[in-house]
Amino acid sequence: MSVFISFEGVDGSGKSTQIRLLLQYLDEQSVPYVFTREPGGTPIAEQIRRVLLDPANRGMSVITEALLFAAARAEHVSRTIRPALEEGKVVICDRFVDSSLVYQGVAGGLPVEFLTQINEMATGALRPHRTIVLDLAPEVALARRTGEEADRIERQSREYHQLVREGYLDLARAEPRRVKVVDASRSVEEVQKDIRRLVEEVLPRRFRGAGTRP
């Protein structure tokens, strides 16, 4: 049985660190997995990523942004995610469709129905078995990123990122079985412990019960 797990959250919420620790844990447990990210995951999708995140493209319209994300996602799903799932692997993805619903929908103002439609076409209606949202106040997330060069989306206003946070929390309330919120303001070890527990809940039985040590 394959499992698809996505990670979401405001920029600076600690996704990269927590995913890295989770992958180390999966290695220790001999769980076959593929790690990938959005936008990106294939050569074509990575080219689209560069366009989307380039600060020089700050004038990009939200509809262009949404369509580019969907195009990258279509390529990503067909060439990376679905093949890995068909091989019975666990797929760990840094962002997926929920990012579009929240960033271009809730924060960007596009109709969620439109975003849902184009992304269902792009993915063949593929949905993660579990989505883990790392929740952190935007001002705290911004402070964590001091010294790092911000991309085009990260340079949006604090109000924009607050809408993103609220969008994720609303999503978790709407889909509580799939979307789980983890308080990312705590220590790295505490956050990782919760993530491992949530991941183990959806892993095939043969991979469960190996412990949740940080």
Swiss-Prot record:
Residues holding ATP: G9, V10, D11, G12, S13, G14, K15, S16
| Keyword tags | ATP-binding, Kinase, Nucleotide biosynthesis, Nucleotide-binding, Transferase
> According to the lineage, what is the superkingdom?
Bacteria
- Family note: Belongs to the thymidylate kinase family.
List the NCBIfam families hit by this protein, alphabetically. DTMP_kinase
> A Pfam family this protein belongs to?
Thymidylate_kin
- What is the recorded name of this protein? Thymidylate kinase
Query: Could you tell me the EC number(s) of this protein?
Result: 2.7.4.9
Q: What class of enzyme is it?
A: transferase
Q: Known InterPro entries for this protein?
A: P-loop_NTPase, Thymidylate_kin-like_dom, Thymidylate_kin_CS, Thymidylate_kinase
In its UniProt entry, the species of origin is given as: Symbiobacterium thermophilum (strain DSM 24528 / JCM 14929 / IAM 14863 / T)
- Matching PANTHER family: THYMIDYLATE KINASE, UMP-CMP KINASE 2, MITOCHONDRIAL
Question: What is this protein's function?
Answer: Phosphorylation of dTMP to form dTDP in both de novo and salvage pathways of dTTP synthesis.
SUPFAM superfamilies according to UniProt: P-loop containing nucleoside triphosphate hydrolases
Question: What reaction does this catalyse?
Answer: dTMP + ATP = dTDP + ADP
GO cellular component terms, semicolon-separated: cytosol
Please give one Gene Ontology molecular function term for this protein: ATP binding
What are the GO BP annotations of this UniProt entry?
dTDP biosynthetic process; dTTP biosynthetic process; dUDP biosynthetic process
